[in-house]
Amino acid sequence: MFFTLSLSASYILIPMEHDKQTNHLKAYGITYWVINQGIEAYWLLNYRGGSFAFPHTKGLENELKVRGVSYQVISDAQWIAIRSEISDPELNQEAVKLEKAPKIAVYTPDFNPRGNRIQPWDDAVTLVLAYAEIPFDKVYDREVLEGKLAQYDWLHLHHEDFTGQFGKFYASQGGTPWYKLNQAKTEELAASLGYSKVSALKLAVAQKIKEYVESGGFMFAM
């Protein structure tokens, strides 16, 4: 009943222009959710800011209202006209059918260097994904070396240091208790995974990520 198609309205269009969409992140999230429900969706590249469209149901319309996403209900004739406009070879536009919601991993530790558990709002990537309501898993060195990246379609990285040299804050913080604790914990992790040095651990992790990308995995790095 929830996904029964309306006979009077054919499609929902989610405009993505900066002045038309009230919540861009939630718009991405609702589109991910729609695809995950097995409903066909389209990404209209270079059309109205890269809009999204999918078949109309009252249930989907209600979900858009709950999430605060701007949308339009358009008729079947309007949808056909949009598709026709996009297909014009003179325009740099395309309607891409979205068929599978990607499984996402974020490379991030459970604790920050000071020993505090990292919350979604402490991390830029997890903050955005959590707010958009896009599901993701956190992975770190152990999961990468255990080959678990193969379970994911996308991998997100931050400003990562894979040298294992602990050099980022050494000059100003090298003698502080939190810095020494972080170094000790990282060395313990390396030892538990069979590495005598953190630099060797990080090299192995970087190589695993390289293999993941070479095998067709998508990586987004900052």
What is the role of each PLM region?
Residues 9-124, 132-134:
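Hydrophobic targeting/anchoring helices
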Residues 12, 16-22, 53-62, 80, ...:
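Helical hinge/lid and interdomain linker segments adjacent to catalytic or ligand-binding clefts
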